[in-house]
Amino acid sequence: MAETQVRNFNINFGPQHPAAHGVLRLVLELDGEVVERVDPHIGLLHRGTEKLMEAKTYLQAVPYLDRLDYVAPMNQEHAYALAVERLLDIEVPKRGQLIRVLYSEIGRILNHLLNVTTQAMDVGALTPPLWGFEEREKLMVFYERACGARMHAAYFRPGGVHQDLPDQLIEDIGKWIDPFFTTLKNLDDLITPNRIFKQRNVDIGVVKLEDAWAWGFSGVMVRGSGAAWDLRKSQPYECYSEMEFDIPVGKNGDCYDRYLIRMEEMRQSARIMRQCVDLLLGKERVGPVSNTDHKIVPPKRGEMKRSMEALIHHFKLYTEGYHVPAGEVYAAVEAPKGEFGVYLVSDGSNKPYRFKLRAPGFAHLQAMDFLCRGHMLADVSAILGSLDIVFGEVDR
């Protein structure tokens, strides 16, 4: 009898695959239906962001950050603004901090809604995305009313935020919060007990805590494995230290735990939003939203029409930009996907000398081989969905 040669089978997953979430290409080595090896090929969305930012003034660099994790753009701007503010040694007024926190949490909900509902869609549930996107639409409108853009906001600037929020907008955000809890409960009732969803996610992609630290995981990926590590609590920035919220922590470190954590984080984000809205309509109702140093923050239009000095400040800001004292700084925020960090080196000029981005998705994607080995081919899309990867920040 002739001996048949059994060999492993190589297939491409993506870049055109609907579950590949963008331009991911995975080269999978399969033994039957079992995954033996995963080789992620990245760089299909590389735009040279870091280098481009080194040729721009500090203000012109802001829009590049929106185009990294474009699902929750303001959270990226936040890290950059914090880094520049630390080098300049300037304070953001309380009202400005509250607006930043409010919009960071809106970004977190935008991100988690997209992730949770598309994760459900990847394993075959078609209702959740329709419900989730209805809520995301309302939040996108809040983005638009704050800064004029639904996605690429350029709203958080070094020194504060671009413009104050009208009271009506803050009231509308307040009115959105309570009905959102009902929507979340509906989503919860639909997905959480679902037998098929559980079979596709429980005990899939398990990460032990020591492995999570070793791979450089952060955010939900670490909390799913049992560590209560959240930069908003452990290294508070802005006014997070004054906010009341809980950190949900998983115990199994599988895809299902990560899903549950994202669901609970949306509730906690809504709690933080409620506190911000109450303060913004209460004792912080009036006040500046950005630093009053006009060498860094442009003066108001009305002021420019009256004062020659204000006009000169405005002209200098938008042509030459401000000079940042020489030094280096690392600023990180708890972005929806994990720890988003900005390492900034200034040489005293009006442009950054070196600009390094620490994208959480990059660290998560590099563990794809470690996570998928020994799983079935169908589990790859479930694992990928639970990592929450957006290619803008991975390839940058």
Swiss-Prot record:
| Any GO CC annotation of this UniProt entry | plasma membrane
Q: Which reaction does it catalyse?
A: a quinone + NADH + 5 H(+)(in) = a quinol + NAD(+) + 4 H(+)(out)
Q: What is its main location?
A: membrane
Q: Which family does it belong to?
A: Belongs to the complex I 49 kDa subunit family.
**SUBUNIT field:** NDH-1 is composed of 14 different subunits. Subunits NuoB, C, D, E, F, and G constitute the peripheral sector of the complex.
Entries under NCBIfam families matching the protein: NuoD, PRK06075.1
Name of this chain's protein: NADH-quinone oxidoreductase subunit D
Q: Which organism is it from?
A: Brucella abortus (strain 2308)
